[in-house]
Amino acid sequence: TAGTNNYTRAQAAAQVRGAYDYHAQTLGWCDIGYNVLVDKFGTIYEGRYGGLDKAVQGAHVGGFNSNNWGISMIGNYETAEPSREMLNSVAEIAGWKAAISGIDPMGKASLYSGGFNGSKFPAGTTATVPSFAGHNDFHYTACPGQYTTRHWDEIRKNTKRKADAIKSGKNSTDLNWQESPQPNTPKTPQQVGEEITSSLGDVEVPVSTISALAGIAAAVF
């Protein structure tokens, strides 16, 4: 999600609450648009209320909000490199969702366009995209950012490794995560954020269809 990259670990949850406040309070939407948010420390947050294991419709890529799942990477990755912890957690949660949904993360998906301003696909047409896709696969936008998209192949491979591990009964700690080369950037220890928290507490908020907000990475499930 386009925004600051300078938040601390203690401030990370407030970034999620800020996204909710903007979506639900400022814009008048019923809930946060993303199904999941991941911070730069690798923490995974539940976004749209309803259960991560359920087919909850989000609102993250206008015209294609049905039959997919939206992951927000908190920060601006057009201007900064996503952390290793963030990349690993995106693959963790996407792989888990792919496994329980019967989706091949390395495959393709055909989605019907409902039409949206800035969409690459007119209303009524079909978009055939990777099963794990980005906002810019659907809309004319820089999102999810140049420093995210250069990791796309890596994330897809690690997502599939996670999905395959779940199907075979392995733990995520058994995985040997693959990294994309990062020129002039020192490598950090590979860590996976395993904490999953709800951004909405016990408040029940009904589902609605709302427009997309720039700055997401959308895992299409």
PLM features per residue range, with description:
Residues T1, N6, A14, G33, ...:
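Basic/polar, cationic surfaces and motifs that engage anionic cell-wall
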Residues T1-L27:
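Cell wall/extracellular polymer interaction/catalysis modules
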Residues C30:
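Carboxylate/His-rich catalytic cores and anion/metal-binding grooves
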